[in-house]
């Protein structure tokens, strides 16, 4: 089998930096799918992405499809010919579909009779004849939310396309894609290297592009270079660069030939909280801040230029000039905000709606204040501090700093509260109320902050569900899924003794007559329990384990978690499968019983040895496990219940449950009812697969 490397590059206007990597990886994945569907062998698919190009390179691609042997079975011989031996219409129709006559068909004998069959060899097509359509299909499936048209073309893409290059080895694959004919022309850097040049062989990519066009097409190479040089620059300045991966990806997507440089700003700006300075450096300017070994911000930053002059001083000065007004703004906002106490912003919250039916932000802070106090009492936090933090929780939203730099909400509240002389736990809670902000984010550290964070999240959940605006489909404008999961994480990971139903009930009472959904408590609890499913599935816990616990609907998250861990452990035991099947059988038997199920076991009515053994063990375990269930030690309890496998199997092998004697029958049903209830103290294990 002969192979060649294949290159496909699409040259465009500047692509959206936050989407570049996703587009490139999707292009490669789509191309792999096309190749596999065509039955073409290849070694691997590499992807390349720069601000003005997307490319894939298929290594060791077979130059033709393999031949395929096909076999199409037709009607049975008995149905293919009539009494006179002439082909029936069914046989003729099948043969016509195969492109043959009935006489050309072969016959195959099976244990079900003799059948007509058509066997043929389909020759594979040359790969070069297939590639243009494959590339077009791969591009058409890219995740582009808002494609655009340009010039007088009718085609659409994420940005205007200027060049298309497709090479199989040294052969140009001709054809039009996105309104542009495939050619050997590559475009280089806008300001460095050659503007246009020719590529003669796929193997020259991407080295030729770097050599002649001053473009590093490999995204990961650019990213690694930026990271290494940034760390090197920061070390030279006696610090450590703050390089988040998302920002690094974005910066990598903005430059074709990265030149990493360091610049500085005036030390006077360090009097402003570092978070505000970092917000504008990272968010607006795409700079990397530098911290000293103690985590304090240094008056330096790192930026990445797309040009590489002999003297970079002008570029450095230019970036310093660009950032200075933004830092000056932050300084001004900070000094202006300090002229008022945080508490003085409370009246202004009355001018901002939280939600039309639910009132203003001032209404929300009043509810958070009360609910945070209630939660604090239950979890052992300082109630006074929790209520104070709840009262001040949204005041920083009215400050100049947060109005201009929105991502500093919370953290600026903390700084302003400290300046006002508020208790440190209160100040920190103003920042930590929003935690966790995203999946995997850290949780509030103190119990006071946890109380405020939970109060804020439950207020939003209860309010929005209370007016019937719960999430539908993928739409979630109030981020209720994130709020629910965040609340669950705080309760579970901090092992807080809170009941979802109780908190939602208290929260709903604080809304007065604003809520219109009479089932708000049940709806919010159901929604939050549903979030558990997503959480545990992400952890790799089996769906049937989660369903087994959900069937019992425990509303204390810490208790729910303990049950899931216990059932997951139990599921791996040797006895689990048999006991799950037995519980399913017990459930089916008891479901057919009319009226109230018998509750009390009478061992004197046990006529068979097997039922007496099981009855005695069930009674003994009820007494033994009651304190374990009360303490939530479910794993230990299930380990003990696993010992019932043998007596349960023996019972079903030797005892007729539905005995003719009504006393025997009722007693046997009581044994099974009590057996099932032991397991139901943890979960419905009959749902385990």
From Swiss-Prot:
Record keyword Zinc present: no
Compartments it resides in: Cytoplasm
E.C. designation(s): 6.1.1.14
InterPro entries, A to Z: DALR_anticod-bd, Gly-tRNA-synth_bsu, Gly-tRNA-synth_heterodimer
Keywords, in A-Z order: Aminoacyl-tRNA synthetase, ATP-binding, Cytoplasm, Ligase, Nucleotide-binding, Protein biosynthesis
GO biological process terms, semicolon-separated: arginyl-tRNA aminoacylation; glycyl-tRNA aminoacylation
Pfam families found in the cross-reference section: DALR_1, tRNA_synt_2f
Matching PROSITE patterns: AA_TRNA_LIGASE_II_GLYAB (PS50861)
GO cellular component terms attached to this protein's record: cytosol
GO molecular function, one term: glycine-tRNA ligase activity
Catalysed transformations (reactions): tRNA(Gly) + glycine + ATP = glycyl-tRNA(Gly) + AMP + diphosphate
Family: Belongs to the class-II aminoacyl-tRNA synthetase family.
Subunit description: Tetramer of two alpha and two beta subunits.
HAMAP family: Gly_tRNA_synth_beta
PANTHER family in alphabetical order: GLYCINE--TRNA LIGASE, CHLOROPLASTIC_MITOCHONDRIAL 2, GLYCYL-TRNA SYNTHETASE
Protein name: Glycine--tRNA ligase beta subunit
Species assigned in the record: Pasteurella multocida (strain Pm70)
């Amino acid at each position: 089998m002969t192979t060649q490397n294949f290159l496909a590059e699409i040259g465009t206007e500047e692509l959206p930096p936050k989407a570049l990597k996703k587009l490139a990886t999707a292009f490669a994945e789509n191309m792999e799918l096309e190749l596999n569907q065509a039955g073409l062998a290849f070694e691997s698919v590499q992807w390349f992405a720069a601000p003005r190009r997307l490319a894939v390179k298929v290594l060791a691609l077979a130059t033709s499809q393999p031949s395929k042997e096909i076999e199409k079975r037709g009607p049975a011989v008995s149905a293919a010919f009539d009494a006179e031996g002439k082909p029936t219409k069914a046989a003729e129709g099948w043969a016509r579909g195969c492109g043959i006559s009935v006489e050309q068909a072969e016959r195959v004998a099976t244990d079900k009779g003799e059948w007509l069959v058509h066997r043929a060899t389909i020759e594979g097509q040359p790969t070069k004849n297939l590639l243009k359509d494959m590339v077009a299909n791969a591009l058409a499936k890219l995740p582009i939310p808002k494609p655009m048209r340009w010039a007088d073309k009718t085609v659409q893409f994420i940005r205007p396309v200027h060049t298309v290059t497709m090479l199989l080895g040294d052969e140009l694959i001709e054809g039009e894609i996105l309104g542009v004919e495939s050619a050997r022309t590559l475009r280089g850097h806008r300001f460095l290297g050659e503007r246009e040049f020719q590529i003669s062989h796929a193997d020259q990519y991407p080295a030729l592009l770097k050599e002649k066009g001053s473009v590093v097409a490999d995204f990961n190479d650019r990213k690694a270079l930026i990271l290494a040089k940034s760390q090197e620059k920061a070390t030279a300045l006696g610090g450590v660069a703050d390089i988040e991966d998302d920002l690094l990806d974005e910066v990598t997507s903005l430059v074709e030939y990265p030149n990493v440089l360091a610049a500085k700003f005036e030390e006077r700006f360090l009097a402003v909280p570092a978070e505000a300075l970092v917000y504008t450096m990272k968010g607006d300017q795409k700079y990397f801040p530098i911290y000293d070994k103690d985590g304090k911000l240094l008056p330096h930053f790192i930026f990445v230029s797309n040009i590489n002059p002999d003297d970079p001083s002008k570029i450095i000065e230019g970036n310093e000039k660009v950032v200075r007004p933004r830092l000056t703004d932050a300084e001004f906002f900070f000094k202006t905000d300090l002229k008022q106490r945080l508490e003085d912003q409370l009246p202004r919250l009355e001018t901002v709606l939280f939600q039309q039916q639910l009132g203003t932000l001032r209404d929300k802070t009043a509810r958070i204040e009360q609910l945070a106090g209630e939660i604090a009492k239950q979890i052992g936090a300082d109630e006074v501090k929790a209520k104070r933090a709840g009262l001040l929780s949204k005041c920083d939203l009215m400050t100049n700093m947060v109005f201009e730099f929105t991502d500093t909400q919370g953290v600026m509240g903390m700084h302003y509260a400290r300046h006002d002389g508020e208790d440190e736990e209160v100040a920190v809670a103003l920042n930590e109320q929003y935690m966790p902000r995203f999946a995997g984010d850290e949780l509030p550290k103190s119990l006071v902050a946890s109380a405020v964070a939970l109060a804020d999240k439950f207020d939003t959940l209860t309010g929005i569900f209370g007016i019937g605006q719960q999430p539908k489909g993928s739409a979630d404008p109030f981020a209720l899924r994130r709020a629910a999961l965040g609340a669950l994480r705080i309760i579970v990971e901090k092992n807080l003794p809170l009941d979802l139903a109780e908190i939602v009930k208290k929260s709903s009472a604080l809304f007065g007559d604003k809520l219109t959904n009479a089932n708000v408590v049940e709806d919010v609890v159901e929604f939050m329990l549903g979030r558990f499913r997503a959480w545990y599935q992400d952890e790799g816990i089996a769906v049937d384990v989660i369903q087994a616990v959900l069937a019992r609907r425990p509303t204390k998250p810490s208790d729910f978690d303990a049950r899931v861990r216990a059932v997951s452990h139990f599921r791996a035991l040797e006895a689990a499968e048999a006991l799950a099947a037995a519980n399913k059988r017990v459930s089916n038997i008891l479901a057919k019983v009319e009226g109230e199920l018998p509750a009390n076991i009478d061992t004197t009515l046990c006529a068979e040895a097997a039922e007496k053994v099981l009855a005695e063990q069930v009674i003994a375990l009820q007494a033994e496990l009651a304190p374990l269930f009360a303490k939530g030690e479910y794993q230990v309890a299930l380990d003990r219940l696993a010992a019932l496998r043998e007596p349960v199997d023996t019972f079903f092998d030797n005892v007729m449950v539905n005995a003719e004697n009504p006393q025997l029958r009722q007693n046997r049903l009581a044994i099974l009812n009590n057996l099932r209830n032991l397991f139901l103290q943890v979960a419905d294990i009959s749902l385990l697969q």
